[in-house]
């Protein structure tokens, strides 16, 4: 069988707070490469979407291509990411690793289109603990990694309930898309063990 993996390398994934040992991008790259190792050992054909290693192949050479791509900084990246259109083989699976925090009108249609091809798949949402807990109070300046979005407030704590409600809404939307298509949604924080996330991801793929 074939497994296609999309690893979000947008600027929002570069975020890392003091509460986490690694950025979202670093964690996504680690999990992507570790998954590639498992797929290689299982003699699966695997491809890395939107890269020169997108064509599914087997073996160590493909794994080395992945390692080279994931260890290099992208030449350019948008503020937020969404999976590009992909043509999935009928006997195949897909994995998307991202924070899925981009604009709703961009992210959700892209996920729906990919999931609507009749194949199994997994969404792995990777967030920093700060993005889940919103531990801010008083005067705070918020700025996206790409510096395209800025907001300053004297009452950060007052934004917490609205932010958490929006986060819950986004996760509900992801869950609905996953349920309709038979995909699975896995949540992971960058202050948690990557090993646990990898095991859950591999199990969701049926142990490949």
Regions found by a protein language model. Give the residues of each.
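Exposed, interaction-prone extracellular/peripheral surfaces
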Residues: 1-208
């Amino acid at each position: 069988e074939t497994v296609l993996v999309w690893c979000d390398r947008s600027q929002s994934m570069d975020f890392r707070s003091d509460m986490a040992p690694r950025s979202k991008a670093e964690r996504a790259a680690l999990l992507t490469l570790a998954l590639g190792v498992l797929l290689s050992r299982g003699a699966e054909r695997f491809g890395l979407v939107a890269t020169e290693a997108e064509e599914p192949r087997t073996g160590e050479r493909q794994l080395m291509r992945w390692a080279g791509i994931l260890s290099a900084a992208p030449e350019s990246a948008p503020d937020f990411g969404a999976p590009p259109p992909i043509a999935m083989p009928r006997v195949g699976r897909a994995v998307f690793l991202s924070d899925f925090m981009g604009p709703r009108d961009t992210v959700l249609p892209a996920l729906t289109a990919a999931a609507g091809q009749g194949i199994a798949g997994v969404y792995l949402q990777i967030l920093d603990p700060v993005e889940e807990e919103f531990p801010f109070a008083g005067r705070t300046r918020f700025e996206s990694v790409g510096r395209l979005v800025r907001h300053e407030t004297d009452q950060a704590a007052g934004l917490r309930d609205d932010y958490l409600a929006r986060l819950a809404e986004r996760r509900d939307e992801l869950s609905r898309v996953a349920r309709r298509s038979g995909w699975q949604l896995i949540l992971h924080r960058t202050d948690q063990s990557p090993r646990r996330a990898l095991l859950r991801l591999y199990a969701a793929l049926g142990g490949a």
